[in-house]
UniProtKB/Swiss-Prot annotation:
Transmembrane segments: none annotated. The active site is at C10. It is an enzyme of class 1 (oxidoreductase). This is Peptide methionine sulfoxide reductase MsrA. The keyword Oxidoreductase applies. Its EC number is 1.8.4.11. GO terms for biological process: protein modification process. SUPFAM superfamilies: Peptide methionine sulfoxide reductase. It holds the Pfam family PMSR. InterPro entries: Met_Sox_Rdtase_MsrA_dom, Met_Sox_Rdtase_MsrA_sf. Signal peptide: none annotated. It comes from the Bacteria. One of its GO terms (molecular function) is peptide-methionine (S)-S-oxide reductase activity.
Amino acid sequence: MATATFAAGCFWGVEETFRKIPGVTGTTVGYTGGHFKEPTYRQVCAGDTGHAEAVRVDYDPDKVTYEQLLDVFWAAHDPTQVDRQGPDIGDQYRSAIFYHDAGQEAAAGASRARLEQSGALSRAIATRIEPAGPFWPAEEYHQRYIDKQRARTGVAPACH
């Protein structure tokens, strides 16, 4: 098994996207990339922790590659937006790839370069590529949030 960590806006929708990928064995939403230990959602949203809303993705590399997960990451959000996704504004919604080893760092950089060179985007990529640090799981009510809301109301909430 292997782990990847991505930030691409509101973690509810990002988690939902990765959970659907064959070979992904688990997801955890949480906070990473900041300087505050064991932050709460309220603290992260206040903008004082430096953390991003992120998703830790556990996967079987025999069934899905890190490069394939990177492709999902790029397609799941607008990587040209700085510290936001859609109407969600703040550095907690930034686009970031948190690499866990040198292989992931190289793959993330190469993937970003391919996307930049493709001409598919009209603006510069704002995605940060940073080493993975401590990951603080979000409160339980955030885990699989879209699934929980769909089960409760019959409708999946909108998420950017």
